[in-house]
Every structure is written in C-alpha cells, then in structure tokens.
Amino acid sequence: YAYQYAAFILYSAYILAKRTFKKRYDLVYVHNMPDVLVMSGLFPKLVGAKVILDQHDPMPELMRTIYNLDEHSMSVRIICWLEKWSLARANLVLTVNKACERLFSERGCPIEKIGVVMNSPDEKIFSYREARPSLSSSKSGDPNKHFVVMYHGSLVERNGLDLAVEALARVRETIPNVELRVFGRSTPYLEQVLQRAKELGIEKHVRYLGSRQLEDLVPEIDACDVGVIPNQRNAFTDINTPTRIFEYLASGKPAIAPRTPGILDYFDAQSLFFFEAGDVAELATRIVDVYSDSSRAFEVAQRGQKMYVAHAWQQEKQTLLKLVSGLLQ
C-alpha cells in the first residue's frame, strides 16, 4: 500500500503541476484514501485553485478496525498526523455524516470548513416505493412462506454477519421458516460463518447467494421481510452511517441496525429497529419483533422512509453543488 500510494501521489502531483502550466485549474477534487493524496493538488493551489478533500472514510478509525491496532500505537499516531496535515491543506473538507464532522472538528479542522454530503443510494436504481404491510408465514396462512432476513454488503468481520447467524439460531424456534439470505463477494470470513451455521445446525436456514450488481439487489430487497445491519462495535462502525439502511428503506422494508452514534444522528427507535452493537440476544429479539408485529414493522419503515426522502441523492447533490459553488465564488 505504502509504495502504491507514494507512487500514485507523486505521479498525480507531477501530472497536475505539468497541466497547470498549460491551463490553470479552478478546482482540484481529491477523494481519500489516502488522505495525503491532497498533496497532488498543492501546486495548482499555489497558483489559485481551490482544493476539496473528500473524506469518506476516516483512516485512523478504519486502520484501527481492519488491523486491530491500538489507538495509541505508533502507526495510528502517524496516520492521525497525516490526516490532520491533509485537512489543513484543503480549502473545503467534505465528509459523509455528522459523526465524522464532529470527529474532524475535534481534530482541529475548523467546523466552518467542513461540509456534510451523505452517501445516498442512486435513485435510478433504488427508487422510492412506499412501505406496505406484509404478513409473516404464520399470519399469511402459507406455512411454506419464508420469513426472509437479508444481509448484503462486504463480508468482513467488522460487518458482523456472524452475529446474524448466531441470532438466527436463537429465533429458529419462534420463527421456524426463518431464512437468512446473504449477498456479497465470497471471503475467508464468509467460509468461517457458513461453517458456524453448520455447527449450529442451521445451514439450511442460511443461503449464500453470491455477489450481485446493485440493479440486481433491488428485487432481492423486495423479496425480503427485513434488512439487517449486524455490525460489530468498533472504532469505524461507531461513526459509520451504512448506506444499506437507506437501500432497504427505499424499498419500504424495515431495517435492524446497531445503536451507534453514526446512526443515532439520523434515526430513532421510531424509524429503525435498534440493537446494541455486538449483542446477539438483542439482535435476535429485534428479528422476532419484526416477525411478531408486522403492523409496527410497517409503521417503523414508513417513518424511516422520511429520512430516506430527506437525504435522497437529489437533495444531497444540491448540497454538494452549493458547497462547491460557494467555494469558487
């Protein structure tokens, strides 16, 4: 990573500097990772260009989570210093939610220099559809109808698919026809989770259906009863607002998500089903809640959709355009 990052930063800095002599840039838009890629825009900035640093993922928190690093370790301290240096070089810092805005502000970036543009689903793919009441297998009169819990996304430990499998084992007696459908690119972690499902005797209740294009996920979401975001608690998931929540809500499906700052900034218990991050028992309880009370699940999904509408990409796009326009004026 270090070699690739360094090579790309130097090459991009050279290209931008060379082109600046021919035609000056008004704006250089830098998207992390790494944060220090902002270095490539320094020469254009010297001759008048504005530099935006788009911080989608705070690197210290992400590296701590991926590599299980202590926050006081030398590696994390270096990454924090590089982040602070990079934030200072930008004219405008963009980030994805209020939690990251607070984080960067606490690390010395002036709050007035930070803009929030949320990660919103593409409305051309995840178009808004009003929530509709659904019936569980016990209430529909069809004993063959599965109660479908859906997970889609990266199959890595921090996203907690193992918690969903453990929760499924707990709810099987209450929901005999429960089925967990999993979508995402196969990883060694997934193999561990599927092996655990066998050990728990629920392998027939867990279906891994492979990776899907975004367009192909929509009918799968339509076919589920509830979407689950079973994140483990860690430095990164604490500040993350998963786009998957909005993807479920766009289709009118209730979602179960961890009670973390990055999510609580936007949702409450009236618009999402919450569990304590890492708590299998509470996650299982929330799955049963959705199954047992379809009327409440419908109402919660309806209220959650209001937040989806408020932060749909058409709204967020206008926020981005206003921030850029204000910077260039």
Please provide the spans of the model-predicted regions.
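Acidic donor-binding loop of glycosyltransferase active sites
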Residues: 91, 221-238, 253
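Nucleotide-activated donor-binding/catalytic signature segment of Leloir-type glycosyltransferases, i.e.
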Residues: 191-216
